[in-house]
Every structure is written in structure tokens, then in C-alpha cells.
């Protein structure tokens, strides 16, 4: 009887330690995830196809996107990054 009580106490202590470590890891993940990185230019879907066919540049000051279609502008990615570098 005494051995089973000691084993039960050890299991409870180990479980509490594991829960504490898990909560500590979740807290550090929340601190890291609070900083969201938004890339300046991203490839997205602009037409009705399921293919990413344009590049958009997000302007945080005016909260709007400038987009260039790959069909109209073959160098859409370069245009997007050039436009973003002008804003800095």
C-alpha cells in the first residue's frame, strides 16, 4: 500500500512539472507570435483561376494594395519590389 502511494505521488509531481513546462513554452510562443511579419510584396490570385497570377505590394500607411498582373506585366515581381523600395 505504501509503495503504491509513493508511486502515485511521483506520477502527480511529474505531471505537474510537465504541465508547468508546457505552459511556459506556450507563453514564449505567444510572445513570438505577437509580432506578425507582413512581407512587402506577395504573390496572390487576381483572376478566377486557382493559379497565383499577380504580385501585390501592401502599403501600410494607406492600407491599400498595389497589384501587377503577370499576364500584363511579365516583370510584376520586380515592379512590386521597386515600388516598395521607393516608399522606404
Swiss-Prot record:
One of its GO terms (biological process) is suspensor development. Disulfide bonds join 41-56, 54-80, 57-67. The keyword Disulfide bond applies. Residues 1-22 form the signal peptide. Belongs to the MEG family. InterPro entries: ESF1_brassicaceae. This is EMBRYO SURROUNDING FACTOR 1-like protein 3. Expressed in stems, leaves and flowers. The gene is ESFL3. Keywords: Disulfide bond, Signal.
